[in-house]
């Protein structure tokens, strides 16, 4: 868990900072800039395969979840999940993001709750619990390879959205710190889940969804609630995978998105009948190895580009500070002194000049407009703004 936590924190920092530096709107922007065109294409294909593979594994998992807790036929839970994904997938991206975001707190609460209960009800013989956990069969025997493979899998899932989230933050420095904080939080949650499973390995062994078995053993009613939460977790992942897959395959042909999205979901539904555990045992390790390679490539590119990234971070932060001074109604701005400096920094940036200027103006005007102590009206500013004043 410690090794996985360190890798996750480093990779989170790398993904978000590279996304910010290249102002990425999709993962290919970064892949194309840091690797050979052939490698970039292979990474893109690997991400596409991952999106589809995890999508159909989630549909299978939805069926197993409901079968384990309520005794439903697996196809019922999978079909219900398919319908939910198809309905929500037809919404616009902002609404999809809100649906996904609404589910996340319940997941965190559930994991913390199980960990607290486990801590208050530790097994009498911790050594026996550890021994029992070591007897559980895993797709990958070696503990170190297993930790690396798990990281590869998780990061392969996260890379596409992480690069885009990083690209939405104009400051590489802030994006990097966001990656550190996110990696630490993820590591804590992973540690809590691992602790719970380790101390209750006798109850979790043999079940498709171990965490559900733990909660159901405590109380069947809580088990039913947990089954619903896990179903929401599965939905969270499934909609993210199939939606991203549809967007990627319809890039440049956005009107085709609904058809591609529906076909992708139906194809995933068909494959899901191979069974959740079977799919996990074969699909997850393969994706994990692809993820290890991808992380190694991006981390190497990040280390190699550190000086440029840091220079760009300083450059953008300096322009932002000068723009704040320039637009603040209560501060004196020396145009003769600073206009040329702003223009030079923008020219030196790796970002498109107009895109960088517009992004920084948007950030600064949003901040000033939201400050009750500053007499600044963003709408009036935009009405009176006719050109980019740094030109």
Feature annotation, model-predicted:
Residues 1, 22-50, 68-73, 211-226, ...:
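Transmembrane-helix boundary/entry motifs in multi-pass membrane transporters
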Residues 314-391:
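Long, low-complexity, intrinsically disordered cytosolic termini of multi-pass membrane proteins
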Residues 21, 58-68, 82-103, 167-171, ...:
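Membrane-water interface regions at transmembrane-helix termini and the short interhelical loops
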Residues 6, 41-48, 68-92, 154-161, ...:
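Transmembrane alpha-helical segments of multi-pass small-molecule transport proteins
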Residues 1, 47-51, 55, 117-122, ...:
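Hydrophobic, membrane-embedded alpha-helices of multi-pass small-molecule transporters
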Residues 2-28, 196-200:
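Juxtamembrane transmembrane-helix boundary signature
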Residues 34-42, 104-119, 182-194, 260-266, ...:
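Small-residue-rich segments of transmembrane alpha-helices in multi-pass membrane proteins
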Residues 107-133, 295-315:
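Hydrophobic alpha-helical segments and their helix-loop junctions in multi-pass secondary transporters
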